[in-house]
Regions:
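Generic alpha-helix detector with strongest preference for long hydrophobic helices that associate
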Residues: 10-13, 17-23, 90-93, 132, ...
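Conserved, well-structured core domains of diverse proteins
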Residues: 1-141, 147-151
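Hydrophobic alpha-helical transmembrane segments
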Residues: 148-152, 170, 221
Length: 277
Protein backbone atom coordinates (compact mmCIF):
# COMPACT_ATOMS: atom_id res chain seq x y z
CA UNK A 1 0.00 0.00 0.00
CA UNK A 2 1.34 3.43 -0.96
CA UNK A 3 2.34 5.53 2.00
CA UNK A 4 0.13 8.57 2.40
CA UNK A 5 2.77 11.25 2.79
CA UNK A 6 2.26 14.94 3.39
CA UNK A 7 3.51 15.74 -0.11
CA UNK A 8 0.96 13.39 -1.67
CA UNK A 9 -1.82 14.86 0.48
CA UNK A 10 -0.93 18.39 -0.61
CA UNK A 11 -0.79 17.28 -4.24
CA UNK A 12 -4.25 15.70 -4.06
CA UNK A 13 -5.66 18.74 -2.26
CA UNK A 14 -4.34 21.19 -4.83
CA UNK A 15 -5.63 18.99 -7.64
CA UNK A 16 -9.18 18.32 -6.45
CA UNK A 17 -9.99 20.98 -3.84
CA UNK A 18 -10.83 24.18 -5.70
CA UNK A 19 -10.94 26.15 -2.44
CA UNK A 20 -7.18 25.68 -1.98
CA UNK A 21 -6.24 27.21 -5.33
CA UNK A 22 -5.27 30.62 -4.03
CA UNK A 23 -3.57 33.36 -5.99
CA UNK A 24 0.14 34.25 -5.77
CA UNK A 25 0.85 37.33 -3.68
CA UNK A 26 3.93 39.41 -2.92
CA UNK A 27 6.53 38.62 -0.26
CA UNK A 28 5.50 41.29 2.24
CA UNK A 29 1.83 40.37 1.89
CA UNK A 30 2.67 36.67 2.34
CA UNK A 31 4.39 37.52 5.62
CA UNK A 32 1.43 39.64 6.65
CA UNK A 33 -0.99 36.78 5.93
CA UNK A 34 1.21 34.38 7.92
CA UNK A 35 1.42 36.55 11.03
CA UNK A 36 -2.19 37.69 10.73
CA UNK A 37 -3.28 34.04 10.60
CA UNK A 38 -1.15 33.19 13.64
CA UNK A 39 -2.60 36.08 15.65
CA UNK A 40 -6.10 35.25 14.43
CA UNK A 41 -5.72 31.66 15.63
CA UNK A 42 -4.15 32.71 18.94
CA UNK A 43 -7.03 35.11 19.57
CA UNK A 44 -9.54 32.27 19.26
CA UNK A 45 -7.59 29.84 21.45
CA UNK A 46 -6.79 32.42 24.13
CA UNK A 47 -10.37 33.64 24.33
CA UNK A 48 -11.54 30.02 24.45
CA UNK A 49 -9.47 29.63 27.61
CA UNK A 50 -10.10 32.91 29.42
CA UNK A 51 -13.53 33.73 28.02
CA UNK A 52 -14.69 35.36 24.81
CA UNK A 53 -15.73 39.02 24.60
CA UNK A 54 -19.40 39.92 24.28
CA UNK A 55 -20.98 38.31 21.25
CA UNK A 56 -21.28 41.36 18.97
CA UNK A 57 -17.56 42.15 19.37
CA UNK A 58 -16.33 38.57 19.17
CA UNK A 59 -18.35 37.64 16.09
CA UNK A 60 -17.46 40.96 14.46
CA UNK A 61 -13.75 40.30 15.00
CA UNK A 62 -14.10 36.74 13.69
CA UNK A 63 -15.99 37.91 10.61
CA UNK A 64 -13.44 40.66 9.95
CA UNK A 65 -10.53 38.22 10.05
CA UNK A 66 -12.24 35.79 7.71
CA UNK A 67 -13.04 38.56 5.23
CA UNK A 68 -9.43 39.80 5.24
CA UNK A 69 -8.01 36.33 4.55
CA UNK A 70 -10.55 35.45 1.86
CA UNK A 71 -10.21 38.59 -0.24
CA UNK A 72 -6.41 38.52 -0.04
CA UNK A 73 -6.13 34.84 -0.94
CA UNK A 74 -8.95 34.12 -3.39
CA UNK A 75 -9.23 35.92 -6.75
CA UNK A 76 -12.52 36.96 -8.24
CA UNK A 77 -12.25 34.55 -11.18
CA UNK A 78 -10.65 31.15 -11.66
CA UNK A 79 -8.51 32.26 -14.57
CA UNK A 80 -6.60 34.47 -12.12
CA UNK A 81 -5.53 31.41 -10.11
CA UNK A 82 -2.79 30.45 -12.54
CA UNK A 83 0.68 30.26 -11.10
CA UNK A 84 3.29 32.93 -11.43
CA UNK A 85 4.89 35.61 -9.34
CA UNK A 86 2.84 38.43 -7.94
CA UNK A 87 3.79 41.84 -9.26
CA UNK A 88 2.73 45.35 -8.36
CA UNK A 89 1.09 46.72 -11.48
CA UNK A 90 -1.48 49.39 -12.11
CA UNK A 91 -4.58 48.59 -10.09
CA UNK A 92 -2.87 45.98 -7.90
CA UNK A 93 -1.04 46.00 -4.59
CA UNK A 94 1.24 43.02 -4.03
CA UNK A 95 -0.82 40.95 -6.45
CA UNK A 96 -4.21 41.89 -4.97
CA UNK A 97 -6.49 44.17 -7.06
CA UNK A 98 -7.67 47.39 -5.49
CA UNK A 99 -11.32 46.30 -5.68
CA UNK A 100 -10.43 43.41 -3.35
CA UNK A 101 -8.84 45.86 -0.91
CA UNK A 102 -12.10 47.82 -1.14
CA UNK A 103 -14.03 44.64 -0.32
CA UNK A 104 -11.79 44.16 2.72
CA UNK A 105 -12.25 47.71 4.02
CA UNK A 106 -16.02 47.68 3.50
CA UNK A 107 -16.38 44.18 4.97
CA UNK A 108 -14.38 44.97 8.10
CA UNK A 109 -16.26 48.24 8.66
CA UNK A 110 -19.63 46.54 8.24
CA UNK A 111 -18.59 43.66 10.53
CA UNK A 112 -17.48 45.95 13.35
CA UNK A 113 -20.27 48.51 12.91
CA UNK A 114 -22.68 46.57 15.13
CA UNK A 115 -20.20 46.53 18.02
CA UNK A 116 -19.16 50.16 17.58
CA UNK A 117 -22.76 51.41 17.65
CA UNK A 118 -24.18 48.89 20.14
CA UNK A 119 -24.43 51.42 22.97
CA UNK A 120 -25.04 54.34 20.65
CA UNK A 121 -22.65 56.77 19.06
CA UNK A 122 -22.34 60.55 19.14
CA UNK A 123 -20.00 62.25 16.69
CA UNK A 124 -19.13 65.92 16.45
CA UNK A 125 -16.82 66.99 13.66
CA UNK A 126 -16.26 70.47 12.20
CA UNK A 127 -19.53 71.68 13.60
CA UNK A 128 -21.51 68.70 12.32
CA UNK A 129 -23.10 66.35 14.83
CA UNK A 130 -24.26 62.82 14.18
CA UNK A 131 -26.02 60.61 16.70
CA UNK A 132 -26.97 56.92 16.60
CA UNK A 133 -29.15 55.57 19.44
CA UNK A 134 -28.22 52.33 21.14
CA UNK A 135 -28.91 49.15 19.27
CA UNK A 136 -31.87 47.97 21.35
CA UNK A 137 -33.80 51.08 20.26
CA UNK A 138 -33.12 50.33 16.59
CA UNK A 139 -34.31 46.71 16.56
CA UNK A 140 -37.19 46.49 14.10
CA UNK A 141 -36.79 50.12 13.02
CA UNK A 142 -33.22 50.33 11.65
CA UNK A 143 -31.73 53.64 10.67
CA UNK A 144 -30.78 54.26 7.04
CA UNK A 145 -27.10 53.88 7.98
CA UNK A 146 -27.92 50.47 9.52
CA UNK A 147 -29.51 49.40 6.25
CA UNK A 148 -26.49 50.64 4.29
CA UNK A 149 -23.93 48.75 6.38
CA UNK A 150 -26.15 45.66 6.52
CA UNK A 151 -26.57 45.66 2.75
CA UNK A 152 -22.83 46.08 2.23
CA UNK A 153 -22.05 43.16 4.55
CA UNK A 154 -24.55 40.93 2.75
CA UNK A 155 -22.93 41.77 -0.61
CA UNK A 156 -19.41 41.16 0.74
CA UNK A 157 -20.38 37.81 2.28
CA UNK A 158 -22.12 36.65 -0.89
CA UNK A 159 -18.96 37.39 -2.87
CA UNK A 160 -16.79 35.67 -0.25
CA UNK A 161 -18.96 32.55 -0.42
CA UNK A 162 -18.87 32.58 -4.22
CA UNK A 163 -15.09 32.74 -4.26
CA UNK A 164 -14.54 29.97 -1.73
CA UNK A 165 -17.22 27.35 -2.42
CA UNK A 166 -18.73 28.31 -5.77
CA UNK A 167 -21.75 30.03 -7.25
CA UNK A 168 -24.47 27.54 -6.23
CA UNK A 169 -24.85 28.61 -2.59
CA UNK A 170 -25.07 32.36 -3.40
CA UNK A 171 -27.73 31.58 -6.01
CA UNK A 172 -29.78 29.67 -3.43
CA UNK A 173 -29.40 32.55 -0.96
CA UNK A 174 -30.48 35.10 -3.57
CA UNK A 175 -33.50 33.01 -4.53
CA UNK A 176 -34.75 32.82 -0.95
CA UNK A 177 -33.93 36.50 -0.41
CA UNK A 178 -36.00 37.36 -3.45
CA UNK A 179 -38.82 35.18 -2.16
CA UNK A 180 -38.78 36.97 1.19
CA UNK A 181 -38.73 40.48 -0.27
CA UNK A 182 -40.82 40.02 -3.43
CA UNK A 183 -43.58 37.93 -1.87
CA UNK A 184 -46.49 40.22 -2.96
CA UNK A 185 -45.37 40.07 -6.61
CA UNK A 186 -45.15 36.29 -6.97
CA UNK A 187 -47.67 35.22 -9.67
CA UNK A 188 -48.34 31.80 -8.08
CA UNK A 189 -51.10 32.35 -5.57
CA UNK A 190 -50.10 29.57 -3.17
CA UNK A 191 -46.59 31.05 -2.87
CA UNK A 192 -47.66 34.68 -2.53
CA UNK A 193 -47.21 36.38 0.85
CA UNK A 194 -47.10 39.96 2.23
CA UNK A 195 -43.30 40.05 2.01
CA UNK A 196 -40.71 42.07 3.90
CA UNK A 197 -39.38 45.53 3.22
CA UNK A 198 -35.67 45.63 2.48
CA UNK A 199 -34.97 47.53 5.69
CA UNK A 200 -36.78 44.91 7.78
CA UNK A 201 -35.00 42.11 5.92
CA UNK A 202 -31.63 43.72 6.63
CA UNK A 203 -32.67 44.22 10.25
CA UNK A 204 -33.39 40.50 10.57
CA UNK A 205 -30.17 39.48 8.80
CA UNK A 206 -27.76 42.00 10.31
CA UNK A 207 -28.50 42.41 13.99
CA UNK A 208 -27.32 39.71 16.47
CA UNK A 209 -29.27 36.56 17.35
CA UNK A 210 -31.30 36.71 14.16
CA UNK A 211 -29.30 36.27 10.96
CA UNK A 212 -25.62 36.64 10.14
CA UNK A 213 -24.66 37.20 13.77
CA UNK A 214 -26.85 34.38 14.99
CA UNK A 215 -26.21 31.04 16.67
CA UNK A 216 -24.40 29.54 13.67
CA UNK A 217 -21.65 32.16 13.58
CA UNK A 218 -21.35 32.05 17.36
CA UNK A 219 -20.78 28.27 17.35
CA UNK A 220 -18.32 28.50 14.45
CA UNK A 221 -16.30 31.24 16.15
CA UNK A 222 -16.25 29.58 19.58
CA UNK A 223 -16.14 25.83 18.87
CA UNK A 224 -15.91 24.73 15.23
CA UNK A 225 -12.97 26.98 14.34
CA UNK A 226 -10.79 25.41 17.03
CA UNK A 227 -11.47 21.83 15.94
CA UNK A 228 -10.95 22.61 12.25
CA UNK A 229 -7.67 24.40 12.96
CA UNK A 230 -6.47 21.52 15.14
CA UNK A 231 -7.30 19.07 12.35
CA UNK A 232 -5.36 21.11 9.79
CA UNK A 233 -2.35 21.45 12.10
CA UNK A 234 -2.46 17.72 12.87
CA UNK A 235 -2.39 16.94 9.16
CA UNK A 236 0.40 19.39 8.39
CA UNK A 237 2.73 18.17 11.17
CA UNK A 238 2.11 14.53 10.31
CA UNK A 239 0.00 13.63 13.33
CA UNK A 240 -2.53 11.89 11.10
CA UNK A 241 0.17 9.70 9.55
CA UNK A 242 1.46 8.96 13.07
CA UNK A 243 -1.89 7.48 14.09
CA UNK A 244 -2.05 5.48 10.84
CA UNK A 245 1.45 4.09 11.48
CA UNK A 246 0.58 3.40 15.12
CA UNK A 247 -2.50 1.43 14.09
CA UNK A 248 -0.47 -0.47 11.48
CA UNK A 249 2.20 -1.41 14.03
CA UNK A 250 -0.41 -2.44 16.59
CA UNK A 251 -2.19 -4.56 13.98
CA UNK A 252 1.10 -6.17 12.94
CA UNK A 253 1.96 -7.05 16.55
CA UNK A 254 -1.52 -8.42 17.11
CA UNK A 255 -1.29 -10.44 13.92
CA UNK A 256 2.07 -11.88 14.93
CA UNK A 257 0.75 -12.83 18.38
CA UNK A 258 -2.30 -14.46 16.81
CA UNK A 259 -0.10 -16.49 14.48
CA UNK A 260 2.03 -17.69 17.40
CA UNK A 261 -1.07 -18.79 19.30
CA UNK A 262 -2.34 -20.71 16.27
CA UNK A 263 0.97 -22.54 15.86
CA UNK A 264 0.96 -23.46 19.54
CA UNK A 265 -2.59 -24.76 19.25
CA UNK A 266 -1.70 -26.82 16.18
CA UNK A 267 0.99 -28.68 18.16
CA UNK A 268 -1.70 -30.08 20.47
CA UNK A 269 -4.03 -31.28 17.72
CA UNK A 270 -4.27 -35.14 17.60
CA UNK A 271 -2.39 -36.74 14.74
CA UNK A 272 -5.55 -38.16 13.12
CA UNK A 273 -7.22 -34.83 13.10
CA UNK A 274 -4.01 -33.28 11.90
CA UNK A 275 -3.99 -35.63 8.96
CA UNK A 276 -7.51 -34.66 8.01
CA UNK A 277 -6.54 -31.01 8.26
Amino acid sequence: MQKFSLERALSLESKYDDSLQTRPIGDWLSKFVLWFSVLFALYHYVTAGIGVPVDFWHMGAHMSGVIVLIFISFPAFKKLKAGGEAVDVMGRLSGVPFYDWLFIVVGVMASLYVGVTWYGLDLNFLGFSFSIPEQVLRMGVPLPIDVVFGTLLIIVLLEAVRRTIGIIVPIIILLFTGYAVLGPYIPIQILKHPGLSWSLFVNNMYFPDLGIYGVTLWIVSTVVFHFVLFGVLAQRIGLGQFFVDLATVADADEGQATGTRLLGLAEHIPSGLDAHI
